[in-house]
Amino acid sequence: MTSLKTPKGTMDESPRQCFLHEEIIERIRRVFVLYGAVPISTPTFEMKSILTNKYGEDTKLIYDLKDQGGEICALRYDLTVPFARYLASNKIRRMKRYQIGRVYRRDQPSIARGRLREFVQADFDIAGECIQMMADAEVVSCVDRILSMFGIGEYRIKVNDRRILTSILEVVGVSCESYGTVCSTIDKIEKMSWEDIGRELVLKGLSEEQVRTTKKYMTMGGKEDVLGLLKADPVYGIERCKAAVHDMEELFRLCRILGCSGSLVMDISLARGLDYYTGMILEAEYVGKSVGSVIGGGRYDNLTENLGERCVSTPCVGFSVGVSRIFSLLYEEYDKESSTMVYVGASGGLFLDERLSVLRILQDANICSETFYTRRSSFESQQKYVAKKKIPFIVVVGESEIAAGSVQVINALTRKKEIVKVEQMVSYLLDPENQ
């Protein structure tokens, strides 16, 4: 017998779920546009060679597709690598773009925590040379605006610099070749105990002493005072670390000007497991919520160059919003079941022609409206439908109303009833005093 269940890590969405997803996406999109970004679209699947060796240990999570006519393809893992491919293939050196679309990962799903195998990401990126940390600060500002907009609660934007992290690993004595795999383990700090982290690092070749030294650095926390601690540490003698610390100081300064430094935290343990990051990295989360980070991103200056021999380097910085995770935090309180503003009902008969005439007037005025389709529908059942869908108004067509060229307008919330001429119906419904 054919199974009717959805594949593991995927889900159907009810109208209520779709309405919330659409609202979240539209609100995020408006913020992207506010910051001057333009939209692009890229294919859901890419050439496998484009995606290979860009995600570190997460490469194993890529969904491969069956060979089609000699092209080895895979479903996109994120929207960042396709954007880099878009820049390189179109020889674009400067762009501020957003893209909202589905991505695919062979991860262990947890629907309650918003972790799926198919999910929507909303990306914002700035490509091109810029004044020191200016684009990075604008990215943080955009993240801050999105997090505050949803009113979910207190949030934290954690930042670090990949160069600081690799400098620490150099001081610890980790080989350059192991930076990526060690960072992938460090990236699990909030999901695993330090004992488990240590065991995994030992399996990757670190000694017990190296693990202890790594832990000392990774447990530095706080705000800009962490940068002061780094300046007093031997790691500051490494030039790339020195440059990164200066960049972080400038980031905090610019974020103060932009009014988004209040939730900004310097976190040395922030690693971001993806291989393509080169500078500032960030993650954002709502404090005390169980879904983990809802936004992640950073600077990736070499990704376009690494796509092929003839590709040039285009500095980029940006972030992805995990729409499903924000959805999981908002859904319980969300109750929208319909976009309909007016339900056209009938009392004492079918009155099909009259209902359709009223429906046309309402829809010509851009008022979302609907009516019933069955041959029989009691007015009581119509009212139950309106209550279930939380439709604000019922416009009732009946024998007496037809004779008078009128309709009865019922406010479904207040139960206020009013007889209104058909030609005045639209203005009555749109009058704020009648809402």
Swiss-Prot record:
UniProt main location, coarse: cytoplasm
PROSITE patterns in the cross-refs: AA_TRNA_LIGASE_II
Compartments reported by the entry: Cytoplasm
Gene3D superfamilies per record: Anticodon-binding domain (3.40.50.800), Bira Bifunctional Protein, Domain 2 (3.30.930.10)
Any single Pfam family the record assigns to this protein: HGTP_anticodon
Catalytic activity, as annotated: tRNA(His) + L-histidine + ATP = L-histidyl-tRNA(His) + AMP + diphosphate + H(+)
Keyword ATP-binding on entry: yes
Gene Ontology biological process: histidyl-tRNA aminoacylation; mitochondrial translation
Keywords associated with the record: Aminoacyl-tRNA synthetase, ATP-binding, Cytoplasm, Ligase, Nucleotide-binding, Protein biosynthesis
Protein name: Probable histidine--tRNA ligase, cytoplasmic
Lineage summary: Eukaryota, Fungi, Fungi incertae sedis, Microsporidia, Unikaryonidae
